[in-house]
Amino acid sequence: MALPLPPASNLHSILLVTKSRSLGPRLVFHYPPLSPSAAALAGAKDPAWYRHDVSTASIGSGSSDSEWDSSTATDDDNDVEIGSRTSGGRGSGRTLTGASFRDRDRSKLGTEVWNKQETIDEDDPDDEDGDRNGRNRRRGGDYDWDTVLGFKTDALEKMLSPGKEFNKRRFELGVESIVFVGAPMFVREDGLWKKLKRRKKKRSDKEKLDDADFVKNLTISEEDEEADTVDEIPVKSKPEPFVYPEGFEPGYGHGSISSGPSGAPSEAGSDARSNSTSQDNNPDMNMFNVVFVLNPPALEYQQRVKEMYDNVTRKYAKALKYEEARFQYVWKESKRIIDLKQRAKESNESLTSTWRKIISTSPLAKSIAIMFDAISHDKIAHIHFDATFNTSFQIPQADSTPYLPTALEPQMPGLWLTTSNVVLADDESPMTQHAALLLLEDTETLIKDLGGEVTGNAAAIAFYIRNIIPTKSLLKISKRHNISAHDMEYIASHLVYWRRARLIAPLSPRDTYIVSPNADFSLLPSAVTAYAQRFPTLPTLPKVLNMLSGTPRPFRNFIPTTEHREAYMDILAWLMRGGWVTQLRTFAWVRVTPEIKAKVAAEMEREERIKKAEEARKELLSDNESVAESLLSDKRSSLLSAGTVRSSTPLRMAHRDRGTGGLGEEDMHHSTILSPRITASAAPSYRGSPTRASSDAGSTSSQRTTIALSSSQRPDSPSRLGVRDVKPHRPSPLHLHPTSPSRGSAVSLASPTATSPPPSPKDFKPSIVYSPQKATSLEARWLEKIGQSFEDVGNIIPTPNPSPPKGQDGGMFGITGKELREAWPILLKHLDGRHAIEDVAPRENMKRKRVAAMYNTIKERGWLVVVRHW
């Protein structure tokens, strides 16, 4: 799991660049009005991770930075006068609440920022009032109209106006220590900023036949566009799809529920757009680029740039393109801003005063100012483009971390410390529906931010929020109040994304909670005051934290009576909301004991012996079959030779007839094969002896008939081979059941069954199976053997109380070996050290007490290694 980066946008400025046929590339607007140079930014690194003001607050929402920070002034309703001074803000201009640059950045960057700009602009030949403007620049650079970020304005205009190949692509330009990130938007070839969605007309068959070129009819000409304008008026022009869910685009408190961008504003936009496009199909402006200037650390460069582009730059550019397609919003506002700047420059007005006029006059400039103040403070920006369309932007932040802060890897103090897997993306069964939703704001405050209950959607969402409690899972709440589970998950994901809630395991008095090691105790004084106002009759915050700092115990041990349970659970929810406490969770791995390993080893040895014996038996049968085939071949050769060579001698023919006349076919078969061997063993002979005339064929056809064989080496006859199960020809020493008594006794001393003792547990050491789902073949056999040993678990484990009372911990809880064996495969999925045992019950739809009893039983047998952490 990657270490989550602390929230730090590293945003220093926002620039708006347009390109038109009449004016060419122009730097229309930049915010803040006074920006330090790139060289000054390179030497002024801000430890953004050490900030304490990052919260769920947002610019324009009117919410405070934290629940207990009563001293922090709330944001003004006026979007122009927003953005309070914070200790962790970036080096950029303050919102126009004053006439000077941000005091903190002025003291940090010093006068060398403006001295660099002064030296650049002193030689400007176009400055008619050089001496006067030079004196003004020495006063603070408030009259420097031709320099932005230490660069000449005309140079920036050319650099930030890319070609059309960058249309809808990320524009990234690094200069010195800063990077320009933008999403250029270009006009279409047909002069439109957005493709029209024509409504198909029903044509008669005659019109279809008159159409000679079908492809030509698919092209929208100017005449067709004007004719279809009337038909397009009832059709609502929908914006390009945003990532935010429908109905939630603007965020809270900005008409997100009562009005949406797909309603009436689309109709008005269609009128304005159709009028403009009908008059001039080629608009003057053909490109605009909103550029965000960043100065990220070198090791965080890729991630910071990607976060800014994906979440803010690209989405903001798409929103502006949508407004431009409706009624040329960007170009009209750009011409207004350029006109105001030109007049102020001619009258020698300061930048701050001019920017104040521009922001109060132009909605586009105001939206850029709000965007900068919110994103640079790591808050949510609520942007009002006009009276009919508004939306919200933010860089999502991590709501928790599994790691403790170190000197080399610092974390934001107060961040929720947990390894809870309720939001694991790679989990097969996510915990969303089984998790509880902890609201980070009061219920009524959150509902008020929704803008009231003026519509059905707002009323429904207000009903959902009022019924959300941190002690019940989303699944239980949906069942109790007859709410769709999909709707509950949808609302939960939305609240979590916009920093209004957090997914946690349902709070329970049976769980254990400890003081978080990542708690920010610098906020303790203000937290004590807020806690006392909320819980005046209950123990103080220091006392509660002191109780939870001792030996970990279930939270129910701190509740004095049943009547205090609800109040103490509210205290626990308040502490979880502020990151003061975290849940102590239980994780386990399977421990394989030496006894289990010895049993598995004995089984594997026995299986190996059986396997070898089976292989030997198959090899023996194969050899016997080959011997039989060889003997049958010898017999055929003998008969064939006897019939051809001796047929000319009547005496031999008669003798052969007499010898075989009283025998059956099978007896003749046996006697013919055995006769050469009997002759060879009965008396000594030599090659060419007359007494062996009848066996010459056998001698020449087989080498076996000329060698005297002992009784132990003599092969069996084919008749005996047919009864192989009764008397095998050559029993293997590895055979389990030797049929020959004499040989069986002879080889029994060398048999492994007699000499190899069974494996002893002393020969093995215990080990841990770290991932049962990815276990090896040997580990799988160990796990299977553990499951088989559950049969006698009730007889082996003694329990002091065979029938413990309901709710008592320990003992068997009535768990039988059969139940354990059936539940063993289910429990194994959670014994990998990553899934908490507390999550098994909701995930597998099991009773919590039964799960605890099973784990206690397995733990008593020594088959678990248990650890507890957050």
UniProtKB/Swiss-Prot annotation:
Q: Where are stretches of biased composition, namely Acidic residues?
A: 120-130
Highest taxon in the source lineage: Eukaryota
Q: Write down a Pfam family by its short name.
A: HTH_NPRL3
Task: Give positions of region: Disordered.
Answer: 56-139, 253-283, 642-768
Here the segments flagged for biased composition (Polar residues) are 273-283, 691-716
Q: Name one GO biological process term.
A: negative regulation of TORC1 signaling
Biased-composition ranges for Low complexity? 56-73, 255-272, 733-754
For this UniProt record, give its keywords in alphabetical order, as a comma-separated list. Meiosis, Signal
Q: Which family does the record claim for this protein?
A: Belongs to the NPR3 family.
- What job does the chain carry out? Mediates inactivation of the TORC1 complex in response to amino acid starvation. Required for meiotic nuclear division.
What name appears for this protein in its UniProt entry?
Answer: Nitrogen permease regulator 3
Give the taxonomic lineage as stored in the record. Eukaryota, Fungi, Dikarya, Ascomycota, Pezizomycotina
